[in-house]
Amino acid sequence: MNMKKALIILALTVLSASLSAQTKKYVFTEASELNLIGKIHKETPNPYHRVDTMKYKGFTKGENCQVRCPAGLAVLFKTNSKNIAIKTEYGWQWESLATMPIAYRGYDLYIKDKGEWRWAGSKATSRKKPNETIVIVKDMDGEEKECMLYLPIYSEVHSVKIGVDKGAEISYLESPFRHRIGIFGSSYTHGYSTSRPGMSYPMQLMRWTGLQFLSLGCSGNCKMQPYFGEVLCDAEVDALVFDSFSNPNAEMIKERLFPFIEQIQKAHPDIPLIFQQTISRERCNFDLKTREMEEAKKEMAAKMMKEACKKYKNVYFIQTNAADALEETSVDGTHPGDYGYTLWAKSIEKPLLKILKKYGIK
């Protein structure tokens, strides 16, 4: 055996031992055995699915995949481990040019610090090694911490295991979040173009306000379909928020809005239904065809909602904004980046809280 081959074998042996040690270093707990929050339907055969697609029918193939993604779901737990690792078994995985892999197939960890949720780490597996163990935070002080781990927004998972150091403890953390506020929306609500799972506008609002938002964001597919209405009708919620005017065209808004409201109100007659105007898309700066289409649907939404707020009780319409003065918060001309979603959350926070307060939601 020549020297080159011997060095290669030695290097592979050391690497293999290192990887084996890294795996053995942690004791793993299935995330669903801890406190899984953010689910619009509490019970699903796969705990990481948002909707039971065996029960609810009518979805397109793409919609079926989307509602099986854990967008908006988070795991609450306590641990005194100095290091936290994650091991995942994926179902289908998505790819995107405008959304970070950490967002669509990775994890985002927050730790409570002086009463506030503070970012602690984010990471994703490599595409070639989806089942590898990743370390999301390391070298902490070993004091007990309250943790919130956001799950991937756009990849199905069958198992999520959280690893802590041998000898460390991990346990269920009671949720500090109040109420159950469902939010049905487009790719914006889903979190498209975010850098990590905790940066969609519902998740930012949730951390700021302490109110629990239950995301049913479905990229490109929030068009007030009756079968999505069935899902919302069966949800245990104190309020519903809608980003319903981003995907449908003007004619679809005109045809579907009132029947959709009536469908939801049959099941939830006494809760607030809060509809958001869609945001302005920066693509419209020079794309005249898109500008015309976007203006038409915004005008139709405003017209129909003016009538809806008079026609139906407990129906509201609020404005949104995801752009700064320079109009440079978009990633691709349609979807905001993290900062744009922060602006969106800030733009609706006060009117949303004012409405919710009327119903004892605070």
Language-model-derived ranges and their functions:
Residues 6-15:
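Sec-dependent N-terminal signal peptides
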Residues 11, 19-180, 353-362:
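N-terminal secretory targeting modules
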Residues 139-141, 145-222, 226-236:
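Serine-esterase "nucleophile elbow" of acetyl-processing enzymes
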Residues 205, 222-258, 263, 278-285:
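Oxyanion-hole/transition-state-stabilizing segment in secreted/luminal serine hydrolases
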Residues 268-273:
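A short helix->loop->beta-strand "cap" motif at the edges of active sites that frequently abuts
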Residues 281-319, 362:
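Substrate-gating cap/lid alpha-helix
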Residues 332-362:
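Histidine-centered active-site loop/cap adjacent to the catalytic His
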